[in-house]
Amino acid sequence: CPGLNAVIRGVTNSLIKTVGARVTGIERGFMGMIERRSRPLDSEAVAGILNQGGTILGTHNFANPFSCNGVDVSDKVMEYVRELGLDALVAIGGDGTMSIANRFTPLGLPVVGVPKTIDNDLMHTERTFGFDSAVAIVAEALARLETTAR
């Protein structure tokens, strides 16, 4: 997931420097909100992550607090949000992530969405990060196949 650590680092450092915010990273996305898994992030915690692959917080693509095994656990997630003292949620992901994140706004949790998808299918975005990476990998694979086919 190229770019995720860059976003985490940028958001963390910007919030600390501009407003003196206390930043909390939720591990494994919405699953971490359900499982109550988080960690504090500061400039030191994100200092060397730009060149690391993946993401320091981990990812999870299938968790939905509004339908966790058919049960809406969003009230428990919001209780955890209040315990952590979160003022906002920065969600990094594609259309699924954004549609889930958007449902927290009426519950009192402002959301900032960072578009990340290889599909490049999010409204109001020209190009999402993840898309260029996918195109580059496909182009490289096609070039290798062409060489092999000769």
Residue ranges and their predicted role:
Residues 1-37:
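N-terminal phosphate-binding or glycine-rich loops at protein starts, especially the Walker A/P-loop
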Residues 35, 100-102, 123:
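Short glycine-/acidic-enriched loop or helix-start segments at secondary-structure transitions
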Residues 24-27, 104-128, 135-137:
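Short, acidic/small-residue loops that bind anionic groups at enzyme active sites
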Residues 27-33, 61-63, 94-97, 117-120:
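Acidic, glycine-rich active-site loops and adjacent beta-strand->loop/helix elements
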Residues 23-27, 57-59, 88-92, 112-114:
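General beta-strand structural signal in soluble alpha/beta enzymes
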Residues 16-18, 47-51, 80-84, 104-106, ...:
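Solvent-exposed alpha-helices and their adjacent loops that cap or buttress functional pockets
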Residues 6-11, 96-109:
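Short Gly/Thr/Asp-enriched flexible loops that form oxyanion-binding sites at enzyme active sites
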Residues 33-91, 127-143:
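Glycine-rich oxoanion-binding loops at beta->alpha junctions
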